[in-house]
Amino acid sequence: MPVRQLFRSGFAFQIPVYQRAYSWGKDQWRVFLEDLVEGQSIGNTYSFGNLLLEDVQTGRLYDIIDGQQRITTMIIFMRAMVNVIKANKYRFRSLSSVNDLERDFIKDRGVVRLTPAPMDAPCFDALIVHNKSVYTATSPSQQNIIDAKDFFTSELMKMQRTTLENIMNYALDAKVNLMVMTGKPEAALMFELQNNRGKRLTTLERLKSFFMYQMYVYSPQADVSSNIASLAGYFSSIYSNLNDLVLIDEDDLLRYHCYAYLGIAFGYRNMDDIVKEFRGAKNKVQWVMDFTYELNQSFINVKALKNIKNVNWDKLVKYHVPPFAYAFIIKGLKYNMNEPAKMADLFELLEKVAFRVKLIGSRADFESRMSDPIRSFQGDVGKLTADIRAKLNDPGSVLYWSDNIFKQRLEGDLYGHGLLHDILWEYEASLLKPKGYTVKQIQIADESIEHISPQTPLDKQGNPLTCYDIDITINKYSNLFIEKYLNCIGNLLLISKSQNSSVGNEPFVDKLASYNSCKLLLQQMEIGAFVSQQPTEWKAVQIEKRRDQIVNFCLGRWKI
């Protein structure tokens, strides 16, 4: 059937609630337009593809089961075509009136040709049906509609009148393979079978279609419509909140939600795990409703993170908020949304855990060890702290995540570690606090890390600097010193790049003078306290002393 016949038949189409919102983007629009431009130039018949419909009102209204992205795009394209023809006052020999094109594809005597999914309807009606020029999007799919209209309008405005007419006719003559079915269960099942066509669906979109289909299968006949409406309402709310997500996308949040609420917790891997838990539910309709309700609440609650003003949340963001932390935050927001002090305690706990995990950097699976704590967490941060502490130090974790492993990592080689600067700034803050200052008041140009005992302990003439821990039998550091002391926290210092360059390989007395003259960083000024008995030397004894002091600070700062 030609596209022109399909639309002149008087059919009206609607997109059922289990369909995804409009998701095509510039790549798909460009291919759509290029196919029309190239096809009309060589004279081949354009295939519009398959269109799978469900008969809702015989001969009048049809649900689109497969092909809704293409139909929506065709109608947006025709709206742009109508606008360009009118703007340029073109007359086409093949078109008696541009109004005919508008009636066929947009609206005819009160009959709107396409009713999109509820979340897209306000935008589509305003921009396409009523041809408004401005609309403020509240979801990614609405923004896609806005951008599609702008794209086609811009591209068509560049074309000559003859090319426009040829493209229009080529689109109208495109062949569409039409299949019509009756019955919602059959239609929903066909949607499941067609769901891998076209642009790949997100997991959230696939989940929506799966849940909608289950409503048809398991709801009592009298409850089908109301259950579908409730589910559609939840997903409409979810999609309306997508633009408010920060740092993560919809599938990330779905994954973190599953960590928080599914029985397998951090064992969740993909949608098959959701389906498996659904299959095991006695009341499947209620299970879907409960899951979707909680998922909607998670999308609503996570919006609060946009406006969170909390130093530990900021640090979590700096650590790229590990997935396990999001799961606890999702549950925390459920129980403590209106309890800022409790949320502050949760952020503090999660920052400590995230820091320790990042510092240790073990390949051992950490998230699975958090499954029991996330299952039992109902907002009590004190209990959660005890649960996590116990998990980190139980027999299954003691070799990977325990307090002792954390201490060993702090005592080891930290040079080049992504958290080294954070550790030294936190240490600086602890030195400033008794004096009533904060690190926010300090700015260092080209921040760098200084090896107090230099990496190359030679003077400008190439002679060994014996003020450092040189093995005099080889005139350089011993392997033991290099492995245990050179890159440990006791030998590392925050410094500006310019100061670092000026003192790099100087004798220790010159370095100490430079540190003492620095009135900006207390960690530089306190170096003298570690060498009061031997002010001309910086060796393993002094490094150990400073290392132990900083490590003890860290053990207290990140104690769980």
Segments predicted by a language model, with ranges:
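Secondary-structure capping and boundary motifs in well-ordered enzyme cores
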Residues: D63-R70, M168-A171, M179-E186, V317-P322, ...
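Betabetaalpha-Me/HNH-type nuclease active-site subdomain
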Residues: D35-S41, T45-R60, S96, G379-Q523
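A cross-family structural signal marking well-folded subdomains
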Residues: L204-L207, Q214-E426, A529, Q533-Q534
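Generic hydrophobic alpha-helical scaffold/packing signal
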Residues: F191, I330, F347, E351, ...
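Glycine- and hydrophobic-rich flexible loops that cap the catalytic core of alpha/beta enzyme folds
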Residues: M1-I264, N505-K559
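Short, conserved catalytic or adaptor-binding loops enriched in Gly and charged residues
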Residues: Q5-F7, L164-A171, A304-N307, D380, ...
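Secondary-structure transition/capping motifs at alpha-helix termini
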Residues: I42-G43, V84-A87, R197-L201, Y335-A341, ...
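Composition- and surface-driven signal marking solvent-exposed, interaction-prone regions
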Residues: F191-L193, T203-K208, I274, P340-E351, ...
